[in-house]
Amino acid sequence: MRFLLSNDDGYFAPGIEALAAGLATLGTVTVVAPERDRSGASNSLTLDRPLMLRRAPNGFHFVNGTPTDCVHLAVTGMLDQQPDMVISGINHGANMGDDTVYSGTVAAATEGFLLGVPSLAVSLAAKPGEHLDTAVQVTLDIVRRMMDRPFTEPTLLNINVPDRPFHELRGTVATRLGRRHHAEPVVKSVNPRGDVVYWVGAAGPAQDAGEGTDFHAVREGFVSVTPLSIDLTGYRQLAELPAWLNP
């Protein structure tokens, strides 16, 4: 089994190191991750400059680009064979609801999915979190299940793991994405040189967090597994649009 592992926290993050060690028990692991923290990079590609691929002393590869760059470069330009699975994580902090739109962790897995490879995005729902070992064990269990019973077509799964000991997890459930309120307003400040600067505000509280959502599952101590789709079509509006365009 050939695994391509990436993240958005950077190649030096504890989460990717722990997951790489775990996945090595199941197959060959290639790590290609950003050279620095690129949280919130979403699905952006670097188009204004060339990318450089370097190798760290621990054998990991790092790129001066985004998480999407890392997976795209690895699959289309670095690896001799397409990986059997792309895994992004383990992220330090949850990626639930609207977070998935901005998340570099989810974006790296999305790129693998777009390239035809089954892909997982894995996040520990706490920052920094105390139980990376739990997230590693959950990921390995899901990977084994995918190896034993593969889906009929490439699948993109977003996994969020409660920050608790493995034996305290209540189970694993299929969920849909919840939704947050809008983010808090930007914070205006002045830097030491007297320039006015702005910090993006914190994520808003969960708004749609009822039963069946990823927020609810994690809050109740369950691992949340949400299948994601790339189709952004608004089908409800699509049904009404022809009559609106041609009254």
Curated annotation (Swiss-Prot):
Cofactor(s) in the UniProt record: a divalent metal cation
GO molecular function: 3'-nucleotidase activity; 5'-nucleotidase activity; exopolyphosphatase activity; metal ion binding; nucleotide binding
Binding site for a divalent metal cation: D8, D9, S39, N91
Record carries keyword Nucleotide-binding: yes
Compartments reported by the entry: Cytoplasm
InterPro entries, alphabetized: SurE, SurE-like_Pase/nucleotidase, SurE-like_sf
Catalysed reaction equations from the record: a ribonucleoside 5'-phosphate + H2O = a ribonucleoside + phosphate
Enzyme Commission number, as recorded: 3.1.3.5
Pfam families tied to this protein: SurE
Annotated keywords: Cytoplasm, Hydrolase, Metal-binding, Nucleotide-binding
Any one of the GO CC terms: cytoplasm
Cofactor stoichiometry and binding remark: Binds 1 divalent metal cation per subunit.
Function: Nucleotidase that shows phosphatase activity on nucleoside 5'-monophosphates.
Membership in a protein family: Belongs to the SurE nucleotidase family.
Alphabetized HAMAP family for the sequence: SurE
Protein's recorded name: 5'-nucleotidase SurE
Source organism per UniProt: Laribacter hongkongensis (strain HLHK9)
Gene name of the encoded protein: surE
